[in-house]
Swiss-Prot record:
Annotated ranges, domain TNase-like: 58-257
Molecular function (Gene Ontology), one example: endonuclease activity
Swiss-Prot/TrEMBL keywords: Calcium, Endonuclease, Hydrolase, Membrane, Metal-binding, Mitochondrion, Nuclease, Transmembrane, Transmembrane helix
Name of this protein: Probable endonuclease LCL3
Superkingdom, natural source: Eukaryota
Segments passing through the bilayer: 15-37
Bilayer disposition of the protein: Single-pass membrane protein
Gene3D superfamilies hit by this protein: 2.40.50.90
Gene expressing this chain: LCL3
Example of a GO cellular component annotation carried by this entry: mitochondrion
PANTHER family in the record: EBNA2 BINDING PROTEIN P100 (PTHR12302), SERINE_THREONINE-PROTEIN KINASE 31 (PTHR12302:SF3)
Short name of one Pfam family: SNase
Subcellular location: Mitochondrion; Membrane
Residues that, per the record, bind Ca(2+): 152
Amino acid sequence: MTEQRTVTNNATHYFYPTVLLFSILLTGGVLTATSFYNKHLRQYKSAKDIPEAIFKKQWLYGKVTSVGDGDNFHFFHTPSGIFGGWGWLRSIPELQTVAFDASVEVPQSVRWWNKLFSAKVANYKSHFMSLHVPYKGRRNLPTISVRLCGVDAPERSHFGKTAQPFSDEALNWLRYKILGQYVWVKPLAVDQYGRCVARVELWSWLKGWQNISIEMLKEGVGVVYEGKVGAEFDNQEDIYLYEELNSKKAKRGLWSQRKFETPGAYKKRT
């Protein structure tokens, strides 16, 4: 009887530490897996889903699924890319391809006096509107609405207001540049419209990394953001101002107009 009690006590003595160790390992494994998922695999479906710790510190990877204006677009987040299962375990939205048709005339937001007095303006407009956008955007997807940081594109017609010159051209250029492409997005803030204000980078084997906001300024399809409240440049404001000045001196894009009103001034006036 005494021997049986001794064996039972010994079994109990070894059993409880084993259970405790197993519980610790299991809990640690669950916490580690959860942390790994949240950091590397969790998909953000709107700007409000992005944790505060991400802003101004980390980059998000994903696909541009639609471009609705000259300085904003919708971003389908694909965390960790192919290593996160995207494209083979997790589906990525496909965009409908658009065949190039040279016979189609595209509208241009050009005013009659620019046509009459400035051939350079017409040439720039023709160039931007002739850029072929190979995809048709898709809406109603679980995407983040992204506002390009540090820049302002000409205002399109909204709520009965007339469109600014080069607004259609800026939109077509941005669609040509990023629609259907995979980009890196660095969240900086959330604006009053619930959009993620972000620095956006596109990789090209020919051009390397391209900051889309800065590319807009180089092409002359946007200006440096004039608002004092909510302006975000990710510590690159000097570069933005430099590229805008270069385009202005060269009368490139929207700077080719004889009379030019910035988007900020236009919004205040109207």
